[in-house]
C-alpha cells in the first residue's frame, strides 16, 4: 500500500495526467498526496546579458509555480481529497529538478513518486533531458510514470 504519494507537478497536460492517476490511487488506497513543483532559476544565470531584471524573473517564476500548485490542489479538492503542496526553488546550475524531487521524496518520506513523462526520444531527449528519467535513476522508492496520450 502506498500511504504517502509524491506527485511532480509542472502544469503540463502530462503532469495533469499524472495528477489524475495519483488522485485515483489516493482514493483507492487512502493515500496522502504531496504535490511538488520545482522552479528552476538556474538557466537565467547562464546569460549575463539578460534583457530583464533577474529578481523580477525569479518572482514571476515563483508566482507561476504557486499558481500551478494552487490549480493542482483545487483539482485534488474537487475529488474530495486533501493534499500538501511544496514549491522547491533551484538557484544554481548544479542543481537539477530530478535530484530535488528525489530528495523531497526522501525527506517526506514518500512510498511512491508519480511523475508524467513526455516520452521524448532521440535528439529531442538529448537536448531537453528528462526529469522523469533522472528520478527513475536515483529514487529509492517506486516510481509510477504516466504518459499523456
What are these regions (language model features)?
Residues 37, 87-89, 147:
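Residue-level recognition of beta-strand->loop/alpha-helix junctions
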Residues 39-42, 91, 121:
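Feature marks short, surface-exposed loop/turn motifs that line or immediately flank catalytic pockets
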Residues 22, 72, 101, 135:
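Aromatic/hydrophobic pocket-lining residues that form π-stacking "cages" and hydrophobic walls in ligand
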Residues 24, 105-149:
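Gly/Ser-rich helix-loop-strand patches that form or flank binding pockets
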Residues 74-113:
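Structural beta-alpha unit
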Residues 38-67, 100-103:
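Acidic, proline/glycine-rich short linear motifs
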Residues 3-52, 75-84:
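Small/aliphatic-rich secondary-structure junction motif
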